[in-house]
Amino acid sequence: MAHYFVGDVQGCFAELKRLLAEVDFNPSRDELWAVGDLVARGPDSLATLRYFQSLGDAGKTVLGNHDLHLLALHGKLKRDKPSDNLAPLLNAPDIASLIDWLRQQPLMRELPEHKVIMTHAGVPPQWSLDVLRQESQLVSQALKQSDYLEALISQMYSDTAERWDPSAIGLNRLRFCINALTRMRYLYVDGHLDFDCKQPPEDCSNPQLRPWFEFTSALRQSHTLVFGHWAALMGKVNDPKLKALDTGCCWGEYLTLWHLEKDQKITQKKLKKG
């Protein structure tokens, strides 16, 4: 059995299929783990979601910011942008089934026997594994409620929940978890989230900002963290316990697959149209 982890697919289904064929992926034997953002911008978000849904227990994903945005679009809480290429998905006959499947997915997954943790954007450095589990579970519980659109999705868009407060309750607590696990790139030196800078660290001109993974973290001492979201990194982090897998396929770059057991990365260049 092999465990394969894939970066932000974002509708780049042809590239995903190329990678899986290259490694002879077999869902009856292997598992495919995705760092989230299965949809948006790429040409085939519909096929991507259908494929992961069809994998059953052989497919594991976490929610990314674009996946959560899809829930808002389907709930008519946001307006679709043509550049996201989501119209075929939103108008698909099985959209209700796909949305229901998507909102059952968590914000974090772990592979305890390998001490691997996967989220979309990373893990706040001040969080322990127990806190990560707890906060992720609170969001998952809210997403599974029948009123999830009104109670959570309609109110999750906020840049105000940028600081971890273990005494927070209600929406602010859920918002921080969503912001941290699906949007985080940089933190200010005092530990609160920045939502603006997307550049790679070498190009960041604000001396008050540091990448989240440069802060001391007890969790990262004991576990390998797999994440995506930050395409500008192009997979380059100087820590063997960090696996940055978003390499910008939807922007014309690469889709990256990481074979856990071999600690090997395989890449597929964005395919040309036609």
Swiss-Prot record:
Does the keyword section mention Transferase? no
| Protein name (database record) | Bis(5'-nucleosyl)-tetraphosphatase, symmetrical
User: Which InterPro entries does its entry note?
Assistant: Ap4A_hydrolase, ApaH, Calcineurin-like_PHP_ApaH, Metallo-depent_PP-like
Query: Which family, according to UniProt?
Result: Belongs to the Ap4A hydrolase family.
Any one GO molecular function term: bis(5'-nucleosyl)-tetraphosphatase (symmetrical) activity
Q: Which CDD domains match?
A: MPP_ApaH
Transmembrane segment boundaries:
none
Offer one example of a GO biological process linked to this entry: RNA decapping
Give the reaction(s) catalysed.
P(1),P(4)-bis(5'-adenosyl) tetraphosphate + H2O = 2 ADP + 2 H(+)
The function of this protein is:
Hydrolyzes diadenosine 5',5'''-P1,P4-tetraphosphate to yield ADP.
Cite a single Pfam family from the UniProt record: Metallophos
Disulfide pairings:
none
Q: What is its EC number?
A: 3.6.1.41
> What gene name is listed for this protein?
apaH
Question: Which UniProt keywords are given for this protein, alphabetically ordered?
Answer: Hydrolase
Q: Which GO terms describe its cellular component?
A: cytoplasm
Q: Which organism is it from?
A: Shewanella sp. (strain MR-7)
Q: What class of enzyme is it?
A: hydrolase
| Superkingdom of source | Bacteria
